[in-house]
């Protein structure tokens, strides 16, 4: 079973607007986000990644590109990796939303919440888990490494799903822009190797890097 590298897209300027992005298209990486993406590509260039999947939203595709280029892989867009459908909340002011009566439910009991005209967290978690499980079935060799580039809440929801954590606790996890979370999935369960890591990723030193450094044994 594979090692999943769950990567959050790089920084963008939309966050400065103070609005909830949801599935908004047309959000591109800013200068810092581009540097984060390039750092990911450099850090993963010697890791034998078999495939790279990405949310089709621009901020994710642009983050995946340096990794794909370094590994000479084609990015596989996966619609089910899009961020949560927040319905009529998309593009709304977070400052205003935080003062709504339901905001405490979003933060403390998300399993009970559905975005107006959008998804529930239960539905979005199931969507992400289904997408990852399809990838796992396709890349089922023990040494396969798969990179998956998408969004913060989806990554936290996926980790919660595979580790059997209550959905209501997923907001306790951290997932910064340009970070990597490593999850090893086997028939007996899942192990969280790293959470919210920034380059370099020394724990991923694989055969290709060892060979470059002259450390392989005959």
Give the predicted meaning of each segment:
Residues 1-2, 84-95, 137, 141-144, ...:
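Acidic, low-complexity terminal tails and accessory targeting/binding regions
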Residues 14, 70-129, 184, 193-197, ...:
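Phosphate-handling substructures
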Residues 12, 154-155:
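Short active-site segment of divalent metal-dependent hydrolases/proteases
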Residues 8, 13-73, 77:
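Active-site-proximal alpha-helix that buttresses catalytic centers in soluble enzyme cores
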Residues 54-55, 126, 149-150:
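Short beta-strand scaffold positions
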Residues 3-9, 148:
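Short, hydrophobic/glycine-enriched beta-strand segments
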Residues 66, 157, 161:
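Active-site signature of alpha/beta-hydrolase-fold catalytic machinery across serine-
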Residues 38-42, 125, 129-137, 159:
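Generic structural signal for well-ordered alpha-helical scaffold segments
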